[in-house]
């Protein structure tokens, strides 16, 4: 397989990690059969008939539409209808249950370790997959295409958590990647681990000779992209609870009984995965930063505020870029660069402070809420005598992840252009409200970004009809599921830009970037003023 085909496999794996739990859960609840028996079904009809959480059921149905099993229509009423692929998929749905059981069983163990009990549960699945006996035989060529798609789902659920564990635990160190090795060199239970390596050998990731394993070129391709799986796999604690999400008490899925600890996502894994995924877009940000800090000194911002600074890596990177590659870098003695890391999470602030000190970078670290810029500006002025408006404001993949606030204006809104599925704690949110909430959120920031603007990297949804035509060419399905079920609000790129305009702000086209630059665009960089 060439690189394009291998990249396509990753996208299909990610599709599977989110879609398989939905298929099994809806099949168990007889919702798939109900859809099969009816031509068109409205969301409200399904939610009422099956006593489902309407908001998350909407997310689930849109995922199935993105995978080509349903047609999904938002206006005039939200409804779905089966496509020609639907009944073929339904024929295989029962056979996917053991995979879902394995996912659920694994959640009782450490997400980032290989333990004996999950291995034992995994072993028969690996064997039946390798023997191609997990799914019934295809009836014809068309049926075989659906079977292949579902086999990728299974493969994704088996491979995804595995490659992330290997990546986070040092398997892709040069020691293993550049020479052959035995199972016992890596794991204290070599017999079980060997079964896993044999499965990966079946997938052509390794060559095996006399119980020695060595990476193939194909295996190296996946190993180097292990972080691509990290964000989606980090949500398996939530996806494994699909029954609760769709039909139960959703608060049990999101937080522990004390209400403090996130239990729907493995945050360390999420950060590890997103770090790898974000690197591509930071290169484009470099170009924009260099341009801004090469302007005459009196036209430059006093510094940068990174909202949602995480571990401080972006601030550290930006400092090095400005110091070494811009006019400002030559005048830091007379025009010091004020770097500010702001985050809602106290642990992130501690890590940022420690990392910046360790790298000999002077920076301010401050608690901040993306939904309350007035307080942030006051604290910044009070503690450091810095005006928020004198800084270039930045954030990466954050605005869609703000805590839901119902918009002040809910009546007389323009009809939404979005085809997204949005919820808060399982409750269905009108798309008009989601757009208006973003408009009002941006308006809060307007007084503080009028001078130098807001440089924002943002994630977007795309129409499920576009996604379904591009299976294997986009990660949109995985993004829609993980964000939809965790109450995050990713709007289409054109809808996002329209919300910016409605807020009274504008987009500087000179600083706009879109990835990819076609109808599949689901990541953008904008300078908003």
Placement of each model-derived feature along the sequence:
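N-terminal accessory segments
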Residues: 1-241, 301
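Short acidic-aromatic active-site loops that bind/stabilize oxyanions
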Residues: 20-21, 25, 271-282, 341, ...
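Conserved adenosyl
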Residues: 113-182, 186-190, 205, 225, ...
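Well-ordered, non-membrane alpha-helical segments in soluble/globular domains
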Residues: 194, 238, 287, 318, ...
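Core SAM-dependent methyltransferase catalytic element
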Residues: 383-384, 504-505, 514-529
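Mobile active-site "lid"/loop adjacent to the S-adenosyl-L-methionine
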Residues: 394-436
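C-terminal alpha-helical "lid/dimerization" subdomain adjacent to the S-adenosyl-L-methionine
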Residues: 421-430, 453-509
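Helix-to-beta-strand junctions that scaffold the AdoMet/dcAdoMet cofactor pocket
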Residues: 449-450
């Amino acid at each position: 397989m060439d690189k394009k085909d291998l990249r396509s496999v990753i996208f299909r794996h990610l599709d599977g990690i989110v879609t398989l739990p939905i298929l099994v859960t809806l099949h168990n609840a007889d919702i798939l059969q109900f859809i099969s028996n009816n031509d068109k079904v409205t969301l409200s009809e399904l939610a009422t008939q099956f006593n489902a959480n309407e908001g998350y059921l909407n997310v689930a149905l849109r995922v199935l539409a993105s995978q080509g099993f349903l047609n999904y229509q938002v206006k005039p009423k939200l409804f779905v209808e089966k496509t020609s692929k639907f009944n073929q998929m339904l024929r295989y749905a029962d056979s996917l249950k053991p995979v879902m059981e394995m996912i659920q069983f694994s959640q009782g163990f450490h997400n980032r370790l290989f333990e004996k009990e999950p291995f034992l549960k995994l072993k028969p699945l690996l064997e039946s997959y390798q023997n191609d006996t997990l799914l019934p035989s295809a009836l014809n060529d068309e049926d075989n295409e659906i079977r292949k798609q579902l086999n990728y789902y299974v493969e994704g659920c088996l491979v995804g958590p595995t490659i992330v564990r290997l990546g986070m635990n040092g398997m892709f160190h040069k020691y293993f990647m550049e020479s052959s090795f035995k199972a016992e060199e890596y794991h204290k239970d070599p017999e079980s681990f060997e079964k896993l390596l044999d499965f990966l050998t079946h997938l052509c990731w390794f060559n095996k000779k006399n119980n020695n394993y060595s990476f193939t070129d194909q295996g190296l391709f996946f190993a180097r992209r292990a972080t691509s799986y990290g964000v989606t796999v980090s949500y398996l604690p939530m996806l494994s609870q699909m029954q609760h999400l769709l039909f139960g008490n959703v608060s049990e899925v999101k937080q522990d009984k004390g209400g403090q600890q996130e239990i729907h996502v493995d945050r360390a894994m999420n950060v590890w995965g997103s770090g790898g995924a974000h690197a591509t877009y930071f290169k484009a940000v470099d170009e924009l930063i260099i341009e801004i800090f090469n302007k005459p000194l009196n036209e430059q911002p006093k510094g940068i505020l990174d909202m949602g600074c995480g571990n401080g890596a972006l601030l550290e990177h930006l400092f090095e870029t400005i110091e070494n590659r811009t006019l400002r870098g030559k005048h830091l003695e007379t025009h010091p660069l004020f770097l500010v890391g702001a985050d809602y999470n106290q642990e992130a602030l501690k890590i940022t402070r420690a990392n910046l000190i360790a790298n000999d970078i002077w920076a301010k670290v401050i608690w901040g809420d993306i939904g309350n810029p007035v307080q942030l500006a006051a604290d910044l002025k009070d503690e450091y005598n810095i005006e928020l408006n004198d800084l270039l404001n930045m954030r990466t993949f954050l605005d869609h992840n703000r805590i839901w606030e119902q918009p002040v204006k809910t009546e007389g809104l323009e009809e939404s252009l979005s085809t997204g599925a949005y919820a808060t704690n399982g409750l269905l949110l009108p798309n008009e409200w989601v757009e208006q909430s973003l408009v009002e959120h941006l308006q809060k920031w307007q007084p503080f970004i009028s001078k130098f603007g807001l440089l924002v990297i943002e994630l977007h949804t795309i129409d499920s009809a576009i996604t379904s035509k591009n299976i294997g060419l986009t990660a949109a399905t995985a993004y829609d599921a993980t964000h939809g079920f965790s109450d995050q609000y990713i709007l289409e790129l054109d809808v996002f830009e329209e919300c910016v305009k409605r807020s009274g702000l504008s987009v500087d086209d000179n600083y706009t970037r879109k990835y990819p630059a076609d109808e599949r665009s689901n990541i953008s960089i904008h300078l908003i003023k």
